[in-house]
Amino acid sequence: MSFMGNGVNKKIITIKSKEKIMSDMRCINLGYVVPKDQADQVQAVFKKHSAWMENFYSDVNNGPDHLISSFFTRADEFIDPMDPSKGVTDKVIFTINERFTSIESIHRHVENAMKNDYFPEFGEIMDKYGTAISLGGEIYHSIR
């Protein structure tokens, strides 16, 4: 019986390949807690970044070679997340989540993002409201 003829061995190869790919991936995950009266201004800056990303990571610019996925979120902050019936605070939570093919792609991303006219504002927001700043995080679990 050939090595590839055994479905179990083929499955092991597939899993090992996925583990190798996963081990190369790196992430940027940023979390912000922003006063509600500043949330729209913060979101406007984040929308500038997402618009830049749409172009920078387009197929024409070989984007899939560097960026795997990206999503930005906005949610009211609960007083008690274990009991949402207690209501929300006067703050909004934003997250920026970007998954890259490698740490080199993150370096490329940061280097190019810093050239944008909105980036000083982006940095100010990070300094003022950033609560979780992770550049180059390793994925240790993922579904899809």
Task: Put a short name on every predicted segment.
Residues F3-N112, K128-R144:
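Short S/T/G/P-rich N-terminal loop/turn motif that feeds into the first structured element of a domain
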